[in-house]
């Protein structure tokens, strides 16, 4: 879950230590790129069972098991044709349930051509604390500098950059968790243009039903004192959506959508792995059926 530069440095350190100390390294990862660059012998597992094992060439050049073949097809390639989609490992059979029935349809004539979100010249700087003995003038760090973009409805936009380049800061400004120094954020609320930065606190609470956030860290973003059911349904309670029965059904449907066992709704976050916790965070963000979902590296 690191950016490529930091990841490469850590992997190089592991490789150097392995050589210096003449030891073996057992690496558990879901990243096939890391496996290809680091591993000599590979074991592919799924649900606690070994699907296939072998050397580097066997796994990457001559896969035998259907699951391993599906893994390779699901990895992005440079030779993908325009419009070509990756092949999912498993298709989720989703029947129309609570979420689809409760979703308010987008009016056909409501600003169909306008972008869902428009960001103009967004900037944010942070003050640097005075550290000199004589207390010189404090400096600034420009975290976001004049960023502009548009997101059409039904489209995805990816922001790419190394750690510390301002991706999370920008995301938090879109959600109004941080206030920008300059710029404008305009949201197309079914044809009505909303100045996000001008919303009052009361208006902002209602607005966040339309825009949700998936946090980068699945450990600190989940309340350890709350069971999964309460975590997923908390947004519904805050916004007064549904009754106990409908919220229970929504929680079950969301658990199925993110590939988690419905029987685990009463468990606490410490019972889950990092990847499972991230799925819980995704389920929570989807509970309100937002029109826009901001994902802060939800890997």
Regions found by a protein language model. Give the residues of each.
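Charged, flexible cofactor/metal-binding loops and thiol motifs
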Residues: 56-117, 129-135
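Conserved catalytic motifs of ABC-family nucleotide-binding domains
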Residues: 289
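ABC ATPase NBD Q-loop/coupling interface
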Residues: 12, 184-206, 243
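Conserved ABC ATPase signature
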Residues: 268-272, 276
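Hydrophobic anchor residue at the start of the ABC signature
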Residues: 6, 10, 282
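Conserved ABC ATPase "signature" region
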Residues: 191-195, 246-263
């Amino acid at each position: 879950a690191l950016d490529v530069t930091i990841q490469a440095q850590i992997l190089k350190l592991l490789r150097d230590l392995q050589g210096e100390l003449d030891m073996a390294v057992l690496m558990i990862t879901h990243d096939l790129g890391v496996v290809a660059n680091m591993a000599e012998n590979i074991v592919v597992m799924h649900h606690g069972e070994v699907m296939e094992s072998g050397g580097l060439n066997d796994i990457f050049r001559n896969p035998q098991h259907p699951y391993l073949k599906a893994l390779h097809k699901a990895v992005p390639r440079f030779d993908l044709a325009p419009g070509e989609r990756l092949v999912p490992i498993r298709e989720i059979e989703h029947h129309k349930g609570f979420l689809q029935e409760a979703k308010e349809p987008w009016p056909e004539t409501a600003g169909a051509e306008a972008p869902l979100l428009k960001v103009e010249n967004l900037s944010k700087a942070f003050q640097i604390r005075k550290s000199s003995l004589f207390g010189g003038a404090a400096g600034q760090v420009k975290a976001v500098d004049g960023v502009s973009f548009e997101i059409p409805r039904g489209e995805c936009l990816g922001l790419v950059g190394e750690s510390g380049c301002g991706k999370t800061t920008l995301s938090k400004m879109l959600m109004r968790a941080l206030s920008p120094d300059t710029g404008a954020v305009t949201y197309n609320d079914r044809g009505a243009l909303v100045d996000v930065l001008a919303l009052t606190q009361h208006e902002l609470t209602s607005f966040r039903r339309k825009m949700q956030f998936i946090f980068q860290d699945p450990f600190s973003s989940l309340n350890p004192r709350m069971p999964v059911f309460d975590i997923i349904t908390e947004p519904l309670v805050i916004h007064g959506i549904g009754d106990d029965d409908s919220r229970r059904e929504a929680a079950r449907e969301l658990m199925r959508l993110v590939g988690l066992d419905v029987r685990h709704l009463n468990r606490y976050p410490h019972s889950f792995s990092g990847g499972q916790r991230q799925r819980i965070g995704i389920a929570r963000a989807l509970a309100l059926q937002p029109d826009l979902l901001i994902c802060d590296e939800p890997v």
